[in-house]
């Protein structure tokens, strides 16, 4: 068959785009950014791609073009974000957007059909390029995802995406994709109309060839949904609803979302050309916002973190994982190990009930994915075969690492170390999922202390992205590197932190929670305190968080922190009454809020359990300015984060920012505690703490690190390059 004949190259170029003309007069443009693992778009590529298209136009008998990646698993992962850091004005950033718009418009205007054959990540500018093509076909491979994630960087699609996508898949669907930045898998993209076909990878090119035979795409009649939304009245209602819903989620903290709605609406109502102008202008302005700078900072920090092992050693391979404890944490750790890490897991519990709980929990998690059509039943069955359990140590002789997830009891954890050293192989690493107990204490008496380490997951394990890796003084570098490698295999972001009370995340969280407690004891209603912090940018308020984590679990950490770090960690004495009243939070339906088991709180809103007020001898009445509530809690967190850096609990400011955002939901648009302090300026940070100290006591006294930085007019990150780790 002619389509299968070898290609004959007509150009050889160092460009990221190379043209090959097949014997059947179909051109194939291979995308391969030199020296990079994935394809990303750079500003200099505009001329390269237009040059390749011009070469194609010179071929008189050309039937059409296919765009396909020459890299194994990446179509185009988006634009090179470092370009934006070089922009010194909104106008410069706007010009970048205009360049992309003009380039893709020329592709759309070509006299012959163009097909995007997509395998791997097709995101951001990569999808905008694909949208400019006549047809799109993607592979059914799990590595293939499509989306416009710019909003997650505080931006909007700047190369025509806000204008092309609504016309392709409909206004409401396009707004949802652009405002959430979520990724679609192949079948989802097909159902939405984002791609024309989704096929096995091995016939991707053949399918693209068949598509080209249809010729240039003609305008298609509007579907009933699009016809309905073409009515100005209906459209007005839709935009109003979307704006209200978005505002309720963002509380005005993410300017990109409002710009997206404005730009999409402008294009729909005033035409594509006006839409392009507004898109480029809005893109330029958003690039210069502090919110986008903060989100881009997190993006670069996350990427930099992935390149470090946390230790000066190579990781040893992990083939088999043991888990002690079949509870919620143990079951969650088993889930991410099997489903993301693709590793066999052996769970040990003291009784069959614990094993069955873990297996049932994993079955339920996988069934949810099957029901959402993100997994086939056969894949669910395969993954379940990776998880087994018993009430003894059979199978643990094969374990390369054993993760302990038992009760927070030092004697019990030491017993677990001893039993693993008796029953597992000499090379087996023992990782404790403790949230508060110092690792060096757990390792006391161990025969192989160099293989004992902390591995602190956050609940729920399948959703929370962070883990803290905690070596003690005698943990080997190989153990650290291996544990970090396992965490990444589980899909986690891992930060290496010091072996001190509370580690990092819980240490900065505790004073924040305590300050909320002081506000409550001053008579401020629970819902007012929580809402103030949610408006500030946290995903949930401190009392809702306590209910979710478990009041009993959270309070176990406080004595450890108080004993080692001082009275600023001591909870108000009145809070003892909460535990004595049997309040554990959501898990027993009794906490700061009421929980109706037939409803979900996010559907109906939480209702405060007002019986807690007389328990604390408090008469609740809103009287504290919400800005002051959030300031008090956040400043306690910032001060403690600076102490952690000063004491070496975290290795650098980058790790502190990642840990706070991914571990407790510190507002991403602020970039993390250290980025936020740099933005405020040390003078403002210290001055605010001193004012609060005068009003509320010495718990607000600024730490030595902050005082010294103010004196020396220093910042945590170099002013010219926020993407480097800081001192």
From Swiss-Prot:
One of its GO terms (biological process) is fatty acid beta-oxidation. SUPFAM superfamilies: 6-phosphogluconate dehydrogenase C-terminal domain-like (SSF48179), ClpP/crotonase (SSF52096), NAD(P)-binding Rossmann-fold domains (SSF51735). Pathway: Lipid metabolism; fatty acid beta-oxidation. Residues 1-200 are annotated as: Enoyl-CoA hydratase. The keyword NAD applies. Its main location: cytoplasm. InterPro entries: 3-OHacyl-CoA_DH_CS, 3-OHacyl-CoA_DH_NAD-bd, 3HC_DH_C, 6-PGluconate_DH-like_C_sf, ClpP/crotonase-like_dom_sf, Enoyl-CoA_hyd/isom_CS, Enoyl-CoA_hydra/iso, FA_oxidation_alpha_subunit. The record marks 128, 150 as: Important for catalytic activity. Residues 316-727 are annotated as: 3-hydroxyacyl-CoA dehydrogenase. Heterotetramer of two alpha chains (FadJ) and two beta chains (FadI). In the N-terminal section; belongs to the enoyl-CoA hydratase/isomerase family. Catalyzes the formation of a hydroxyacyl-CoA by addition of water on enoyl-CoA. Also exhibits 3-hydroxyacyl-CoA epimerase and 3-hydroxyacyl-CoA dehydrogenase activities. This is Fatty acid oxidation complex subunit alpha.
